[in-house]
């Protein structure tokens, strides 16, 4: 009976293979192998009740030819799902730390980040004084978008006796201190608005993050990756991340950011047309993040050469032989010719020489459905 790639990996592991314990990297243009591995990843995640996050670094939704099975696919950019609906709640050190971390990743320094936290607390406190204790939303923050609006709200509290003139002046002073940061934050919220909805990701949902559509807008790609990392850190056991990569360009910083910052215990996989077009430092990160690597046919000979080196060398012993024939008349009697005693055969085993296990020419011309499985120090050619 033929052995499939999961059985082989399980054998190498000396135990049954399960997706939570491994991370897969598939690199190459072979759509058959990519589809087989991708569908197994998707099916396993669905059966275990995981929300699937698809980081799609391609120019086309169908470019990677990976089906999503029974998952309901939703586009995160359409506001169909919330990745940070509690981002505006700064009522605990943990939530404040999360917001500060996200703001720092997006270019806000520590002082400005704390002014934004102070601003959100100011809005929350004022809303509570007005009798509204619900969670903060973008709509509520818009009501505090200018000095005139804030002054009007606080005057209401003074008129109803809920706020003294002294506290009124104090709060207006506080607002003037943080209003500059508040203005910057509101601009930032315009980008965040699609991810601040009320619909939480569910186990039957595949959240599509089309980062490839923002190839010319690197900050937008980085913001999407930061939001994803922030969400995964809060929901490690409930999510699977699948990165689809077209393999174009040496600088794919947002992918490396995800791989470097995502929790070690989280589940992440990557299917790429060519992961070896990344720079040397980034390739080193890939090798560390993904213990199971599958290399299929690559069109870029430079990438083929890198895989050739990665798979290492083996000792090859080459044999040579010579035949010396005695053409003297006396050595060519019928008996000599019949018994072969008119010739001398010499076989020589040369000293071992180093050769690449898989030459780049082979990697460049591999058959469809064939790949090299690189796992636990073993590198074998495998038919899928």
Language-model segments: residues:
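P-loop NTPase motor core of the ASCE superfamily
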Residues: 108-114, 279-384
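Residue-level detector of flexible, active-site-proximal loop/helix-junction positions
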Residues: 78-80, 275, 300
């Amino acid at each position: 009976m033929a052995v499939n790639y999961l059985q082989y990996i399980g054998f190498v592991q000396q135990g049954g293979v399960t997706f939570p314990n491994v991370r897969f990297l598939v690199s190459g243009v072979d759509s058959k192998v990519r589809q087989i591995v991708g569908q197994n990843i998707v099916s396993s995640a669905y059966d275990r009740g995981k929300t699937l996050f698809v980081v799609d670094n391609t120019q086309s939704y169908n470019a990677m030819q990976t089906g999503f099975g029974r998952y309901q696919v939703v586009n995160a950019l359409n506001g169909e799902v919330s990745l940070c609906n509690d981002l505006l709640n700064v009522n605990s050190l943990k939530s404040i730390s999360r917001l500060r971390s996200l703001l720092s990743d997006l270019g806000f320094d520590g002082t400005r980040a704390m002014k934004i936290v102070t601003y959100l607390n100011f809005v929350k406190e004022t809303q509570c004084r007005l009798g509204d204790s619900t969670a903060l939303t973008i709509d509520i923050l818009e009501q505090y978008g200018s000095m005139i609006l804030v002054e009007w709200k606080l005057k209401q509290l003074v008129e109803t006796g809920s706020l003294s003139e002294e506290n009124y002046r104090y709060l207006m002073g506080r607002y003037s201190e943080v209003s500059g940061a508040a203005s910057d934050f509101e601009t930032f919220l315009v980008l965040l608005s699609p991810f601040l909805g009320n619909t939480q990701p569910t186990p039957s949902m595949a959240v599509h993050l089309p980062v490839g559509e923002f190839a010319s807008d690197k900050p937008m790609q980085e913001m999407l990756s930061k939001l994803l990392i922030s969400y995964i850190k809060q929901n490690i056991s409930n999510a699977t991340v699948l990165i689809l990569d077209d393999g174009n360009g040496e600088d794919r910083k947002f992918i490396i950011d995800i791989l470097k910052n995502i929790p070690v215990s989280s589940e992440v996989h990557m299917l790429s047309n060519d992961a070896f077009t990344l720079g040397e430092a980034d390739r080193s990160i890939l090798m560390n993040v993904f213990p199971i690597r599958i290399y299929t046919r690559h069109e870029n000979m430079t990438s083929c050469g890198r895989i050739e080196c990665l798979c290492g060398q083996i000792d090859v012993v080459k044999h040579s032989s010579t035949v010396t024939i005695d053409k003297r008349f006396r050595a060519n009697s019928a008996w000599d010719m019949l018994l072969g005693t008119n010739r001398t055969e010499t076989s020589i085993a040369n000293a071992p020489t180093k050769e690449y296990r898989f030459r780049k020419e082979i990697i460049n011309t591999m058959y469809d459905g064939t790949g090299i499985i690189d796992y636990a120090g073993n590198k074998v050619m495998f038919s899928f």
